[in-house]
């Protein structure tokens, strides 16, 4: 008797999935088995889908975009009852994000290097490390490398420096995330070319011949190479010798043509954010509206959605007639960076920018239903929506939303005056397309690697 309500709920869940057009294995529809970790439902749902192949995968990462950050952007931009583009995916789950120490024991709050390594390689590592093992510091094969081996086109788009942790995990292996350019190798002596290593993150990224690399970090690529085949030149010059078209603004990006890889460098450092406003403060701020412009953002800086659209065009054109598809990662990086700075307007604007890129990706998938689109975060972050009458510790700001309401956001994960910190909570993962059902339930970040590998049948 005690199992009947559970079975009714399970059957209803299976029926809902069938109504949404998702094939449900008999094991899931008829069985109430599951494990204590909460992994049972996703494992069952993923069974029997070997023939359900994706030609393309688009992975969109909101750096630091926990549920609180999504809710804040939704409340401000489209209203509490509204829905963002990222809210419209048919299938949604959550995943855990912890990293590990050098002995493999959980470190409950990850950084972006370890979290990115999780989905890029399917393995946990220590904070600060880029796609290398936690104890022995050995390179681990990434999803982008597998995609290349299987003949897929590949791309990485970010609003951070292209050498920042999240893009770096795809096409480089580094002992420490700080080893961005040839002049930044202090923390990675064994990775230097002189020691037989692969060089800096910037050098590795172009050596990997990723078809589309778009983001910031021009200053890293303009550093001089001091060792190896390209000694004496800059990483940008190395890229050009390897056949890259190098572009630095929206006009150059628009004119980039398929047939040669593209390196887009749109800022010396991180690409400046789209929105500005007063940072949160002790005791709060006067109610403010965000300014939807930024004087530090140069004219001619392409938006994240425009970069995503162009990347899709280039990757599709490269594969025309081959029968093979592509893997593209798109990162909204400064959600995290403005969260660290307790800057609600900057944070909301960058979430809105990623949401427009999500719209582009979903539109592409609507026209190409063999495309798996996934959106998620690397980790959760600090911002919390609190009652207007509350006087919380830390830093607060009151915003006047687009629907005319007042909203108070608080940042209290570190002492005022210091950068706010990541949090260790699970984050949303949502998807549509072939094998999207794998994101359902509570999974772990490392399982995203398996989802993509399975959908693309990478070997």
Regions found by a protein language model. Give the residues of each.
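N-terminal export and membrane-targeting signals
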Residues: 1-17
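C-terminal region of N-terminal signal peptides and the immediate post-cleavage residues
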Residues: 22-43
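A short acidic-Thr-Gly-centered motif at the start of a beta-strand
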Residues: 43-53, 363
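Active-site-adjacent structural elements in enzyme catalytic domains
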Residues: 53-69, 74, 135-151, 161
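A post-motif C-terminal structural segment
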Residues: 54-56, 65-70, 75-117, 163-459
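Structural beta-sheet core signal
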Residues: 59-60, 156, 375
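Noncatalytic scaffold domains of N-terminal-nucleophile
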Residues: 99-135, 145, 154-159, 163
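Secondary-structure transition into beta-strands, especially the periplasmic turns and strand N-termini
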Residues: 151-153, 368
């Amino acid at each position: 008797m005690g199992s009947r309500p559970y079975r009714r709920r399970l059957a209803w869940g299976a029926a809902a999935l069938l109504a949404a057009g998702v094939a449900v294995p008999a094991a899931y529809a008829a069985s109430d088995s599951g494990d204590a970790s909460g992994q049972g439902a996703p494992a069952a749902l993923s069974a029997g889908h070997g023939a359900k192949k994706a030609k393309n995968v688009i992975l969109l990462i909101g750096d630091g975009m926990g549920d609180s950050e999504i809710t804040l952007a939704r409340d401000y931009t489209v209203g509490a009852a509204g829905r963002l583009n990222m809210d419209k995916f048919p299938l949604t789950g959550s995943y855990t994000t912890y990293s590990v120490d050098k002995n493999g024991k959980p470190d409950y709050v990850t950084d972006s290097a370890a979290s990115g390594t999780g989905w890029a390689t399917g393995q946990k590592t220590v904070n600060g490390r880029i796609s290398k093992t936690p104890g022995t510091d050995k390179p681990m094969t990434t999803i982008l490398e597998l995609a290349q081996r299987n003949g897929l086109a590949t791309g990485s788009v970010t609003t951070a420096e292209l050498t920042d942790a999240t893009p770096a995990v795809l096409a480089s292996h580094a002992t420490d995330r700080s080893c961005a350019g040839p002049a930044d190798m202090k923390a990675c002596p064994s990775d230097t070319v002189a020691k037989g290593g692969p060089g800096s993150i910037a050098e590795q990224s172009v050596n990997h011949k990723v078809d589309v690399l778009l983001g910031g970090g021009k200053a890293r690529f303009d550093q001089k190479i001091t060792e190896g085949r390209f000694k004496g030149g800059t990483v940008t010059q190395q890229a050009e010798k390897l056949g890259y078209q190098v572009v630095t603004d929206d006009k150059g990006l628009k004119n980039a043509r398929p047939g040669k890889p593209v390196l887009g460098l749109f800022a010396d450092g991180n690409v400046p954010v789209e929105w500005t406003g007063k940072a949160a403060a002790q005791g709060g701020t006067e109610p403010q509206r965000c300014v939807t412009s930024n004087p530090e953002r140069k004219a001619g800086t392409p938006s994240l959605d425009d970069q995503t659209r162009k990347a899709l065009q280039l990757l599709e054109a490269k594969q025309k007639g081959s029968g093979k598809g592509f893997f593209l990662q798109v990162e909204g990086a400064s959600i995290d960076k403005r969260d660290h700075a307790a800057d609600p307007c900057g944070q909301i604007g960058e979430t809105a920018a990623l949401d427009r890129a999500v719209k582009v990706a979903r539109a592409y998938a609507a026209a190409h239903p063999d495309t798996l689109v996934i959106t998620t975060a690397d980790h959760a972050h600090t911002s919390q929506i609190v009652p207007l009458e509350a006087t919380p510790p830390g830093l607060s700001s009151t915003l006047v939303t687009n629907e005319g309401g007042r909203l108070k956001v608080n940042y209290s994960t570190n002492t005022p005056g210091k950068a706010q910190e990541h949090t260790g909570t699970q984050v949303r993962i949502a998807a549509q397309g072939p094998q999207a059902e794998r994101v359902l339930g509570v999974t772990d970040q490392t399982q995203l690697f398996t989802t993509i590998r399975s959908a693309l049948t990478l070997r």
